[in-house]
Amino acid sequence: MIGAMIRVQGLRKHFGDSQILKGIDFEVPPQTVLGVIGASGSGKSTLLRCLNGLETIDGGTIECGHVRLEAGLSHHDYRKRVRELRLKVGTVFQHFYLFPHLSVLGNIIEAPVHVLRTPRNTAQTEAYELLESVGLKVAARRYPGSLSGGEQQRVAIARALAMHPALLLLDEPTSALDPRRINSLRTLLRTFVDRGHTMIIISHSMGFLGGVADHILFMDGGHVVEHGPAEQVLNSPQDARTKEFLEQAE
């Protein structure tokens, strides 16, 4: 895995007779952002759910750190690898899924305390540091229902980072944000990348990805059609299907 934080090779996924992912190959270098684009139904969301172990893969491999998830393992070994993978991969879902009965601080320390067995005092100290990083330290004792959508998203990012993931996945992070909040999110994510984090972001916002992603991967029909530097793919796509998609997305 030298030179890659995550490497995906020959990834396949089907639901019944429907092939959703048809041999996906890519890798993401450390401390970079990969933006994944494509029309609805192209396989983006299924890819994300495979990367964090929410969907069982039917072919190929996913490697992150020393964890190698592959099709064909016994049920016991596969579930064991999935548990290991989830400790490496954090996810910020489109709808955040914060616990409404827990405070902001409680949401962030829940997994470190109960999954990683981090001492509560240590987890709280780290949580306050993360909240300060996302500009919400003063909201530590508030509850999710009292927060705006943008604030809830920042809590979700802090919660994911509290598990010290090697890779952070973000699903449509701009879907509920106004332009000012989108610019703020772009700056926040690049700050975390500069601090050493690696990310994969699924988004329909080309403008957002143009300011945050290092590389872009375009999917169509369950295939990787084009993958390259963000500026090249977004401004000078090499494949006609990528060009058509970008023209329609404008």
Label every PLM stretch briefly:
Residues 162-166:
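A short, proline-enriched helix->beta-strand linker immediately N-terminal to the Walker B motif
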Residues 143-147, 151:
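Conserved ABC ATPase signature
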Residues 68-71, 120-139:
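Conserved ABC ATPase "signature" region
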Residues 209-211:
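A short, surface-exposed alpha-helical micro-motif characterized by mixed small hydrophobic
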Residues 168-171:
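Catalytic Walker B motif of ABC-type/P-loop ATPase nucleotide-binding domains
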Residues 52:
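Helix-to-loop junction immediately C-terminal to a conserved catalytic motif
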